[in-house]
Amino acid sequence: MADLYPSLAQCAIVATAFKILLFPAYKSTDFEVHRNWLAITHSLPVKEWYYEKTSEWTLDYPPFFAAFEWLLSQVAQYADPAMLTVKNLNYDSWQTIYFQRATVIISELVLVFALNRFIKSAPQSNKHLAHISSLSILLSPGLLIIDHIHFQYNGFMYGVLILSIVLARKQSTLLYSGITFAILLCMKHIHLYLSLAYFVYLLRTYCLDPKSVFRPRFGNIFKLGLGVISVFAVAFGPFIYWNQLLQLKDRLFPFSRGLCHAYWAPNIWAMYSFVDRALILLAPRLGLSINEEALTSVTRGLVGDTSFAVLPEVTKEHTFALTFLFQLLPLIKLWRSPGDWDVFVGAITLCGYASFLFGWHVHEKAVLLIIIPFSLIALRDRRYFSAFRSLAIAGHVSLFPLLFTAAEFPIKTVYTVFWLVLFLFVFEQVAPVPERPRIFPIVDRFSLLYLAVAIPLIIYCSLLHQLIFGLERYEFLPLMFMSSYSALGVVGSWIGFMVVYFTA
């Protein structure tokens, strides 16, 4: 790996220096969320962690992440003990800011380690491709925006996910892959959306004989079952003993929230909401009835029960059924391809797509659940890259509304555009020519046109709209345009990758 330049370590050092410069940048309410979790886990006994509600930002991550916060709090007391007081709401001394920002960077070493393992696990002929993909993840504008400005710990947890995926590459480490993924589920439950792909792959490849599903490997079944059950027992056992499992369920799965987040995530429901919004204007001419009570919801994107003015309502059951259906399709191929790692990663990616496109109350940040695993196989050949390109554009541009302050506008825009131009150009140059011809070569032209529209759209939504309409008029339009534009790219990418996946 000495000939791979620049190395992961070199890029990580330069990126760290840049991220340190961002310490004083804008931070979202998620910063206070994690400060409060530091205080809760440090100040209260474990059995009170999921009952504490002094702050509205209650602990709603699984126990292993709470334990991670507890570990951080043991060091935080030396930086500024005041940050660990539960009643010290919205406390953000410089010591607190620097400490919390630094923990994000340090925890990202897990991502660097996982990417290094990914490169080492690649066949010798593909190591340079794995290296390029790894650099694109390490320097991702998504992680920069969400983790190092907005504030979260996604780099750390996606490092655990990548490590689990890499461990699934060899039969000898499949057991550790399943256990690592179980640990990840006990850290952030959004990864449940990927669990069916793991279940099918581990069952077919590790628990059953690849040559016959009627020959179970009882030793492997026992080891995997014992390992996974042990992980969940350690995580949830104490809360079961304290009879707190229902309380954890209410915290981890707050289904009282509406279909759409305040800013529509770029998915099917964003397009559905956009069509509903357009039909409000056309309804009088078309003779359609309008639900007057829903007008506030469709224009403001409130977090409560989302209602539609013209189109039929969407229930939780609808979203669950659609998500399961579109996850089931790639799992059929995965079941029929035991031991095929590329098919496994493709199935993980498509499970991520299905949950993001059809899920209930999806956050725009969840687009990384697609981008990160897809990046690992985006350079398999140019057909994969063609499907990945519009996702990379749409997914990263859709994150811009997270940073709405003027000071961060040039940072997010210049960094993201530079990343897109650099890595999409490099990907285009190095992606191998596929053995089969591309079914829809027009997709490439669509991707280029889609990229060309991104820059003027960003300029309008971030600058021109306020100059034209002011701060009070049509304030929902920029978010609606950005969300709908991004949704078009994500959905187009999903359709393209579905075709590639099933014809590969």
Swiss-Prot record:
The EC number(s) this enzyme carries: 2.4.1.265
Which cellular compartments is it found in? Endoplasmic reticulum membrane
Reply yes or no: does the keyword Glycosyltransferase apply: yes
TM helices/strands, residue ranges: 4-24, 96-116, 129-149, 151-168, 183-203, 221-241, 262-282, 343-363, 391-411, 414-434, 451-471, 480-500
Reaction(s) the record says it catalyses: an alpha-D-Glc-(1->3)-alpha-D-Man-(1->2)-alpha-D-Man-(1->2)-alpha-D-Man-(1->3)-[alpha-D-Man-(1->2)-alpha-D-Man-(1->3)-[alpha-D-Man-(1->2)-alpha-D-Man-(1->6)]-alpha-D-Man-(1->6)]-beta-D-Man-(1->4)-beta-D-GlcNAc-(1->4)-alpha-D-GlcNAc-diphospho-di-trans,poly-cis-dolichol + a di-trans,poly-cis-dolichyl beta-D-glucosyl phosphate = an alpha-D-Glc-(1->3)-alpha-D-Glc-(1->3)-alpha-D-Man-(1->2)-alpha-D-Man-(1->2)-alpha-D-Man-(1->3)-[alpha-D-Man-(1->2)-alpha-D-Man-(1->3)-[alpha-D-Man-(1->2)-alpha-D-Man-(1->6)]-alpha-D-Man-(1->6)]-beta-D-Man-(1->4)-beta-D-GlcNAc-(1->4)-alpha-D-GlcNAc-diphospho-di-trans,poly-cis-dolichol + a di-trans,poly-cis-dolichyl phosphate + H(+)
Give one GO term, molecular function aspect. Answer: dolichyl pyrophosphate Glc1Man9GlcNAc2 alpha-1,3-glucosyltransferase activity
The segments annotated as topological domain Cytoplasmic are 25-95, 150, 204-220, 283-342, 412-413, 472-479
UniProt keyword Transmembrane helix, yes or no:
yes
Record's bilayer topology term = Multi-pass membrane protein
State any GO CC term. endoplasmic reticulum membrane
Q: Offer one Pfam family short name for this entry.
A: Alg6_Alg8
Question: What are the protein's UniProt keywords?
Answer: Endoplasmic reticulum, Glycosyltransferase, Membrane, Transferase, Transmembrane, Transmembrane helix
Question: Under which pathway is this protein filed?
Answer: Protein modification; protein glycosylation
Lumenal-facing ranges: 1-3, 117-128, 169-182, 242-261, 364-390, 435-450, 501-504
Biological process GO terms, please?
dolichol-linked oligosaccharide biosynthetic process; protein N-linked glycosylation
* Enzyme class name: transferase
In UniProt terms, what function does this protein have?
Answer: Dolichyl pyrophosphate Glc1Man9GlcNAc2 alpha-1,3-glucosyltransferase that operates in the biosynthetic pathway of dolichol-linked oligosaccharides, the glycan precursors employed in protein asparagine (N)-glycosylation. The assembly of dolichol-linked oligosaccharides begins on the cytosolic side of the endoplasmic reticulum membrane and finishes in its lumen. The sequential addition of sugars to dolichol pyrophosphate produces dolichol-linked oligosaccharides containing fourteen sugars, including two GlcNAcs, nine mannoses and three glucoses.
PANTHER family the UniProt entry points to: DOLICHYL GLYCOSYLTRANSFERASE, DOLICHYL PYROPHOSPHATE GLC1MAN9GLCNAC2 ALPHA-1,3-GLUCOSYLTRANSFERASE-RELATED
Q: Which family does it belong to?
A: Belongs to the ALG6/ALG8 glucosyltransferase family.
**Protein name as annotated:** Dolichyl pyrophosphate Glc1Man9GlcNAc2 alpha-1,3-glucosyltransferase
Q: Which gene encodes it?
A: alg8
